[in-house]
Each structure stands twice: as structure tokens, then as C-alpha cells.
């Protein structure tokens, strides 16, 4: 905390009028997007957010077309319109695209677009990371979807259960494309989540303490935490299955001590939290729209925040909800069943808060299109929640499992809980990004077609499921009596498509994207995103003293637009935004932001090319694309920590802020902490796999006498500890101005870290352990492989840091690069020590026990 930074609103506005000539023009010039071909290098959140939303909507439409093809096939019994192989690809791609390429990216996209303005910031803290995440998602997703046109689309279902997807039963490249493609796209989602979390915690407007944050910001903070913890599990699962397919490591082969159930545990450790990762942001949009429509603040703000946190925690206890029919012990099933019911309580708190807000409205406003979609959301989502409680009852789940009842429940929860609120958000926030609002008349047509079509399409699926129709069948015999219900469902699906088509017509007729001249606050809402804004966001950054500042401070919009609050210009000559305290939102320093550039785009191309070429086993081109990705990332990071050569800046009211920061106050330090959390989640998922395989096949574990001798892990641990000590010594030398000490310590420490990994792998090999022998060996080498991956990353970072030192870009006051490297370094050492203890201690304990 900087001494003297204000904790209470200023008595007078920070800047007097008139403002200097040319100040606003210079600000807009600094933030202007590139023209021509260079436009794709834009990094502004308002442009990247629009691109994100447009791409997510494209994937929604493509997945919808696949659904229409499936419904056409199922409309009548014994239909031969589509063969079973293509049908398998259609339902796999439909689920995969909807879940991985539409749902999560769409809510992240809304956050990228809205949050900076909602928080009173100029932009997110890592604009080039936003650009990289978007282009990686767009390029990878489009190439992945195009696989269906060449017969390479995955066909094992969107959750890809082995052994069906093992090389024995799916030897073609289809499954590999899913495993590598989706694993790579999840990395993009994690990058976006880290950016959003740091932005919410560190770039809020002065005065916007945690209890004054908009509900949408709270929810996106919870969303980011859930992504950081949950998504690594599916990355681990995809990596293990790809290792089994490519190199024969038997994680899921029962004859070698593996277990296909491990995939289900890892997948649903990610999969069920993902339901709430999708639902919570949609609920956040509802919590923003309803107060604006009701003309009063949200009832029970603190209770809603508590419900958000409770839902986030409970969602991680529900993964067995999807595994009731797998033979898991009854006690475990009972806990999962209870948790599945308990999670409905915080969800109910939010629903009742919305109803209470509408009931307490001072006057009823005309029912506009956003409210129609929200009312549709209420109806559909509550029905989905009721069927969710039904399938949480174990005996009923055994009957309904893998039938169309579950298909209906899934769509009532996800379409009702996410798609309808998202369309409400499109109609509500369109004036924020467009010169014109969307049409009320066309919006009503779109709503009623989608609402009626959805219920006609999916409600009968409850009945077909109860009548015994299984999921994923491409045809059925007339004698089962499912024909009429399936025809009704098909009619409903095409009605939904008609509603979406009306929405697209509305977009084409009325959407005129404009960052500088939008339609304005047509809803008379009270939150900051409705401030007058341009390409740089709001003209000046306000002091926030309530949750609805536009309602409680009537002159705020005019004063912000006149430049009377903080940071009305570009005092550093470039892009910048305020960094504030994570809890109290006191101004701490001015963050200089990078502008547009090619490195993030080329890094995304390289990353996408690397993973996609690995899929088709083109190793040399894949390596070249990987080199391109690493080179471009290093290039953009080279200038990411500018020299503290600018004097403190007067941002208004006599408040002078430095233009750089080091240590735990730095925004980049917070991002690295979150990256460490991702690494820890990956490590925990691998430890879970290691221990789970012990519980299922202890017979393949070696006796204590067959393990590597004790001196090996002791030597490895000593190297790890020495490596950490060298990193600490380098940091001490940097603080004292002894750069030569740092330049020697970092490469030597990285070498010791790599040697520790090599020693551990060598010890296991000398003990006779081969990764293809059995599941125990495979899990041991997987843990060593993770440690080696982190050691390589630390080696790159240490050499990069040493290079910055040689180039004169590192010092006691310019040490963010070293601080971040040291943070990951010490975590890697800690993980290595824990891993060594587990690999050498647990088998001995288990053998003796």
C-alpha cells in the first residue's frame, strides 16, 4: 500500500475544467486500433471482446446445424438419411463444439468485452494475452471443426470414454484430434481466466471495494477460480489418454493394471464444475439485467455473493453424480447424491433474489426483449433443476442413465441456464457496442420461436427416455413407439432454428458496431459500463462510492466525460490504466499497457499449428510451429517490463503514482500465483491418478525391495534444494546490484533442476521400471514427465531472465521478470520434493502395510 493514497472519496473532483486542448484527442490517438491488414493485431478489449463473441456465436450456429442434421435423421423410424459412422461424428462434434467452443468461450468473451468498463478500467491488465488466447481459440477451433469435412472428426462421444476411444477400438486419428485439439483449447480458456481474475482484483476503479463490485464481476472472479482449478483435470485426462494411444502407457488398460474409470473421474472432476462455470456467468448477466429493468438494486446482494461462493465450492463435490451406474460403493454415492441436492440451495437463493427484485420494483416497466428471455430462462432452468434433483436420486438415475431423459435434462439446464440469458444479454448490451439497439419486434419473434421450439423439442425427450430410448442411437425400429415423440422433437428443433434465424436477421439489420459512438444507456442502468466511452474506455476513471454509481451520483457521467476524474489523458505518452488494491481498491500505481503487435497473433498461429500437426504425426512441421510460438512469446515478453524511467504521474487531485511496481504488489506477480495454482491442480490430478490406480490394481505395484535405492531420491532432493537456494541467491544479488551473481546462479540452478529430474528418471529405469509395463510404471513416469516439463519451462525463463540482465533490462527496481521466474522456480522445487516423497515413500509404506 502506498502511503498517502486516498481511502475516501475526494472532497473536490480531481481535475478542474477546462481540460487542456488536445488532451482527449491524444488519448484517443494512443488507443486507436490499427488499420488495414494490421487490424488483426488489435489488443483493445472492446475489439477482442467483439471478435470473441462473434466467433463463439459462429460455433453456436455450426453446432446447431449439426443438431438439425441429427434431428432430421431421428424424425422417423428406420431412417437411412445419415449412416451410423457420420452420425457418431455429428453427435460427438455437436457436444464438443457446444461445450468447449461455444459455452465457455462465449461467457469469457462477454467478460472481456464488459468487465473493464464495468470496473472503470481502461483495459484488462494483459491485453496481448487476450489477443493470444482469442486467436489460439479461433484458429484451433475452426481447424478442429473442419475435420468433419474430411472424415477425421472424433466419433467417441463428447466425453470420449475409454476403452472405446483407446487405440484398440479407435485406431484412426479422430480421437487424437479431439484429445490434442481440446486440450490445447482448454489452455486458451485458462489464459483468459487468469487475465480476468487479475483484472477484477487489481484494476477496479478507486473506491470500488469488494462489497461494491457488480455481481457480474463477483461471478467472473468465481468463474476464473473454477476454471483454474477444474480445467487442469481434463488437460491431464487428455494427456494420459494420448500417451496411451501414442506410446502404449497403460493408464486405462485393465489387463495392465489400468482402469477406464480413471478417465471418468478426471473428466467429471472437470465436467460437473463446468456446468456451473457455464451457468454462473449467465446468472451474473441476469443479476445485472433485472435491476436495470426493475429500476432498483438487486435484493440480497450479500446473500447472492455468498450463494456464488457456495455454488463454486459445492460444484467440485458433484463429479460422481455422473457415475452412479459404474459400481462405486454406496457410501460414496450417498455423499454425491446429497451434494447434488445441496447445490440447488444456493441456486435457489439467486432465483429468489431475482424474483424479490422484480417484486420490489417501484413501478412496472414495459416487458422488453431482455426480460422475455430472462422469464424464459426462469421457466426452462427451473424445470431443468427439478429433473436434476430427480437424477440425483440414485435409484431413479439407474433407470434414466444413458437415456434421452438425461439428454432432455442436460439441455434444459444448459440451454435454459446459459443460452437464454446470453440472448437476453445480447439484446440488453447491444446499445453498449452498437449505434443502434436491436429491434423489439424481431426480438419478440426470436424469443417466442426459440422458447416454444425449445419446449416442443426437448420436453418430449423426457418421455422418450422414460420409454427406454438410449442416447447416441442413429436410428430405431418403429415397433418401439418412439416415432411420434421424435417427430415432435424434430419440429421443435427447427422452430428453435427459425428463432435463431430471426435473431440473425435482427443483427444484420440493426447491429452497427461502434466503440466510439454507441447508442448509450437506453435502459437507464446504474453500473459503470454505461458511462460515455470511446476507444480508450471512459474518458476519466471515477471514484466509486456505491454499487450503482450512475443512480447514486447523478452528475457522474457528465463529470467522467468532461475528464474531471482520474487519468483523463495519456500522461506517459502511451496506454495506461490504474492498478488498485485487491480489497480496498486504493490506487497503487499506473500500469503501462502494450499496444497492438504481431507477436501474440503469430504465437497463437504457432501454438495451434504445433498441436494440430502433432495430431497428424507431422513431427518436423509441428516442431517448427512450436519454435515459432516460443520465439513470438519471448519477443512480446521482452518489452513487457518497461524501465522505471518515468517520474511519478499526477493522475488527479494531487495523487502521484509510480509507473511501475515490483514484488507482491505487481499485477504480474498475481498472474504468476494463478499460474502456479494451475500447475498445482495438474499435479494434484496426476497424484489422484497415481493413488486411484493403486486402489484398483495394487498387485502391479512393486515390493519395497524392488524400488530404487534410498540414496537416489536423497540425491535428487538435494539437487532440488540446491537449485532453489541458487535462485534465492540470484535474487539476493539482484537486490544488492550484483548482476554477475544472478547471471551465474540462474543457469546453474536450472541445470541442477534438470539434473534432479534426470536422476529421478534414471533411478526408476535402473530399478527395472518401464513405462509400458503396467499402470504403476506409467503413472510414475507421468509424474516425472510433469516435473520435467516444469523444469524445461523454468530453464527457458531463467535463461530469458539472464538475457535481460545482460541487456540491461533487469535491476532492483525492474525485477518483475525475476520475481515471476523465482515464484515458478520455488513451486517447481516444492512439487519435486513432494513428488519424490510420494514416489519413494508411499510404495514403501503401502508395501509394509
Q: Residue spans of the language-model regions?
A:
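Membrane-embedded and interfacial regions of multi-pass energy-transducing membrane proteins
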Residues: 2-708, 760, 766-772, 778, ...
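Final/C-terminal transmembrane alpha-helix of multipass membrane proteins
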Residues: 603, 819-843
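Acidic/histidine-enriched, beta-strand-rich ligand/metal-binding domains
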Residues: 667, 732, 802-806
Amino acid at each position: 500500500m502506498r502511503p498517502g493514497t486516498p481511502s475516501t472519496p475526494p472532497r473536490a473532483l480531481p481535475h478542474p475544467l477546462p481540460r487542456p486542448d488536445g488532451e482527449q484527442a491524444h488519448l484517443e490517438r494512443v488507443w486507436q486500433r490499427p488499420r488495414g491488414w494490421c487490424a488483426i493485431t488489435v489488443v483493445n478489449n472492446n475489439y477482442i471482446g467483439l471478435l470473441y463473441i462473434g466467433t463463439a456465436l459462429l460455433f453456436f450456429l455450426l453446432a446447431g446445424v449439426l443438431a438439425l442434421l441429427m434431428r432430421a435423421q431421428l424424425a422417423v423410424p428406420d431412417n437411412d438419411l445419415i449412416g451410423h459412422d457420420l452420425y457418431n461424428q455429428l453427435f460427438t462434434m455437436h457436444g464438443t463444439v457446444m461445450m468447449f467452443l461455444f459455452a465457455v468461450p462465449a461467457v469469457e468473451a462477454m467478460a472481456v468485452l464488459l468487465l473493464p468498463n464495468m470496473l472503470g478500467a481502461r483495459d484488462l491488465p494483459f491485453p496481448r494475452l487476450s489477443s493470444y488466447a482469442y486467436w489460439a481459440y479461433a484458429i484451433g477451433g475452426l481447424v478442429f471443426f473442419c475435420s468433419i469435412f474430411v472424415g477425421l472428426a472424433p466419433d467417441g462421444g463428447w466425453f470420449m470414454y475409454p476403452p472405446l476411444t483407446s487405440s484398440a477400438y479407435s485406431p484412426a486419428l479422430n480421437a487424437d484430434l479431439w484429445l490434442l485439439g481440446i486440450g490445447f483449447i482448454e489452455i486458451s480458456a485458462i489464459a483468459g481466466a487468469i487475465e480476468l481474475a487479475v483484472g477484477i482484483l487489481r484494476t477496479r476503479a478507486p473506491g470500488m471495494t469488494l462489497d461494491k463490485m457488480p455481481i457480474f464481476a463477483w461471478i467472473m472472479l468465481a468463474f476464473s477460480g473454477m476454471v483454474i482449478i477444474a480445467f487442469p483435470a481434463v488437460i491431464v485426462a487428455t494427456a494420459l489418454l494420448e500417451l496411451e494411444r501414442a506410446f502404449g502407457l497403460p493408464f486405462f488398460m485393465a489387463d495392465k493394471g489400468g482402469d477406464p474409470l480413471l478417465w471418468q473421474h478426471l473428466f467429471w472432476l472437470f465436467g460437473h464444475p463446468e456446468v456451473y462455470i457455464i451457468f454462473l456467468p449467465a446468472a451474473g448477466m441476469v443479476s445485472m439485467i433485472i435491476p436495470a429493468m426493475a429500476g432498483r438494486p438487486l435484493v440480497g446482494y450479500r446473500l447472492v455473493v455468498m450463494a456464488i461462493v457456495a455454488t463454486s465450492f459445492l460444484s467440485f463435490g458433484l463429479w460422481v453424480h455422473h457415475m452412479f451406474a459404474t459400481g462405486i460403493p454406496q457410501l460414496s454415492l450417498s455423499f454425491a447424491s446429497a451434494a447434488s441436492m445441496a447445490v440447488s440451495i444456493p441456486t435457489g437463493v439467486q432465483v429468489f433474489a431475482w424474483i424479490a427484485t422484480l417484486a420490489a420494483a417501484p413501478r412496472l416497466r414495459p416487458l422488453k426483449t431482455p426480460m422475455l428471455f430472462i422469464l424464459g430462462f426462469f421457466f426452462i432452468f427451473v424445470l431443468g433443476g427439478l429433473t436434476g434433483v430427480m437424477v440425483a436420486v440414485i435409484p431413479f438415475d439407474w433407470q434414466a442413465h444413458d437415456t434421452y431423459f438425461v439428454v432432455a435434462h442436460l439441455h434444459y439446464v444448459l440451454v435454459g441456464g446459459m443460452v437464454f440469458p446470453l440472448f437476453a444479454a445480447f439484446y440488453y448490451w447491444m446499445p453498449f457496442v452498437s449505434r443502434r439497439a436491436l429491434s423489439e419486434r424481431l426480438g419478440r419473434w426470436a424469443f417466442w420461436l426459440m422458447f416454444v421450439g425449445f419446449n416442443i423439442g426437448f420436453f418430449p425427450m423426457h418421455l422418450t427416455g422414460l420409454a427406454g430410448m438410449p442416447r447416441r442411437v442413429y436410428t430405431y425400429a418403429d415397433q418401439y413407439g418412439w416415432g411420434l415423440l421424435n417427430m415432435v422433437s424434430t419440429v421443435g428443433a427447427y422452430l428453435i432454428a427459425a428463432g435463431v434465424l430471426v435473431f440473425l436477421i435482427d443483427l444484420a439489420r440493426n447491429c452497427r458496431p461502434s466503440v466510439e459512438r454507441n447508442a448509450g444507456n437506453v435502459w437507464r442502468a446504474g453500473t459503470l459500463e454505461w458511462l460515455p466511452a470511446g476507444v480508450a474506455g471512459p474518458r476519466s476513471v471515477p471514484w466509486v462510492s456505491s454499487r450503482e454509481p450512475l443512480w447514486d451520483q447523478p452528475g457522474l457521467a457528465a463529470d467522467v466525460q468532461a475528464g474531471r476524474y482520474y487519468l483523463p489523458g495519456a500522461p506517459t505518452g502511451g496506454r495506461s490504466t490504474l492498478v488498485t488494491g485487491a480489497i480496498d481498491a486504493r490506487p497503487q500505481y499506473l500500469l503501462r499497457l502494450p499496444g497492438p503487435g504481431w507477436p501474440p497473433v503469430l504465437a497463437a498461429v504457432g501454438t495451434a499449428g504445433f498441436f494440430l500437426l502433432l495430431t497428424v504425426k507431422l513431427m518436423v512441421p509441428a516442431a517448427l510451429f512450436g519454435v515459432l510460438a516460443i520465439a513470438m512469446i519471448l519477443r512480446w515478453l521482452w518489452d513487457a517490463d518497461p524501465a522505471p524511467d518515468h517520474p511519478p504521474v499526477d493522475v488527479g487531485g494531487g495523487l502521484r503514482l509510480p509507473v511501475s511496481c515490483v514484488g507482491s504488489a505487481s499485477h504480474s506477480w498475481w498472474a504468476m500465483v494463478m499460474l502456479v495454482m494451475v500447475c498445482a491442480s495438474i499435479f494434484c490430478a496426476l497424484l489422484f491418478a497415481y493413488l486411484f490406480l493403486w486402489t484398483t490394481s495394487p498387485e502391479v505395484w512393486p515390493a519395497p525391495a524392488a524400488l530404487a535405492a534410498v540414496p537416489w531420491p536423497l540425491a535428487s532432493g538435494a539437487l532440488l534444494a540446491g537449485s532453489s537456494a541458487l535462485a534465492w541467491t540470484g535474487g539476493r544479488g539482484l537486490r544488492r546490484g550484483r548482476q554477475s551473481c544472478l547471471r551465474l546462479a540462474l543457469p546453474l540452478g536450472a541445470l541442477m533442476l534438470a539434473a534432479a529430474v534426470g536422476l529421478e528418471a534414471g533411478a526408476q529405469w535402473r530399478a527395472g521400471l518401464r513405462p509400458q509395463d503396467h499402470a504403476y510404471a506409467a503413472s510414475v513416469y507421468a509424474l516425472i514427465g510433469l516435473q520435467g516439463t516444469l523444469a524445461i519451462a523454468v530453464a527457458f525463463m531463467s535463461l530469458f531472465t539472464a538475457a535481460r540482465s545482460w541487456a540491461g533490462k533487469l535491476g532492483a527496481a525492474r525485477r518483475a521478470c525475476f520475481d515471476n521466474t523465482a515464484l515458478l522456480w520455488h513451486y517447481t522445487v516444492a512439487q519435486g520434493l513432494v513428488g519424490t516423497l510420494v514416489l519413494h515413500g508411499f510404495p514403501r509404506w503401502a508395501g509394509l502395510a
